[in-house]
Amino acid sequence: MDEKQIFQEMVTILKPYVKDPALLENATKDTHILDDLKVNSARLVDVIIKCEDVFDIEIDDDDADQIRTIGDAVNVIQGKLN
């Protein structure tokens, strides 16, 4: 799975957790999950668990702590898939 596919899947995963789905329409790798998309930190944990299920990977606490933007999530996932 390439970076673009992972990014698109991340947008799909984030949709239920974003209060205003329109915010995802112009999302980029630099979009901050907590600040720009208004996902609270408790919901971010749910997003990470969903990523683990969808991509069949395990994201440890150190990797989870690095996830701030959609691009951060893509990089962590890509690293786990390779």
Name these PLM-found stretches:
Residues 7-11, 15, 30, 48, ...:
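An amphipathic alpha-helix signature
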